[in-house]
């Protein structure tokens, strides 16, 4: 994929605002009071997950949305987007084929996701995030480059895994540059925890790959420890350490900036092993609050 998968500069409306022409012919941003940000787009907290007493690994934030992103959310969400609302999901129906599907949790502005989709059109990517500009940008990139193997999911990935995806339905899990929650008191918010891996394992087919990447060394060490200790996964590296960056994971602009500053990026590549007990119970609602 060429370097054309970048976000163009556009007028920047406020969160959920629409562009309108002012009397002087310039653009201004308006939204009626009480009007949803995107009537045909992603909903705020679609499954009501914030009423659950559970620690979360993400922090929703309101961000400015460009005109192009807003247009993509309105126009393409009914086609390629879905809200994580707790209802069972049929991946064959969602993608319109029986191709393998990988789950990507957290995709930023979506440029790396779009590149991977372009390089592997026979694999579906179910990309989850709560960042509205990124959702709109990824939809825009998919539309511009004819990438029909991307679906954008809005909401809590735990609910998606726990309530919406059937067992053994995923051929891979990708978690690239998750929030490291660097403060010690926030470490419990990190996504890669034993409870999360136990839940994810029930949705991953034997042989499916779990691929994580981070430039935060302490988090990389925790990921390596947790994945190594988990009985449902094995390290693909004979030495038992970090993996070289696989060719299918593109170098992102964010990652490039970090490398220029001397940051070290660690990739972890683990394989889902054949479960010893096919009837092992699902975990409770992953990472319960105290």
From Swiss-Prot:
InterPro entries: SAM-dependent_MTases_sf, tRNA_(Gua-N-7)_MeTrfase_Trmb, tRNA_methyltr_TrmB_bact
Short name of any one Pfam family annotated for the protein: Methyltransf_4
Record-listed S-adenosyl-L-methionine binding positions: 104, 129, 156, 179
Documented EC number(s): 2.1.1.33
Listed GO CC annotations: tRNA methyltransferase complex
Recorded superkingdom: Bacteria
Binding site for substrate: 183, 215, 252-255
Active site: 179
Region (Disordered): 1-49
Recorded family membership: Belongs to the class I-like SAM-binding methyltransferase superfamily. TrmB family.
Name recorded for this polypeptide: tRNA (guanine-N(7)-)-methyltransferase
Source organism (scientific name): Streptomyces avermitilis (strain ATCC 31267 / DSM 46492 / JCM 5070 / NBRC 14893 / NCIMB 12804 / NRRL 8165 / MA-4680)
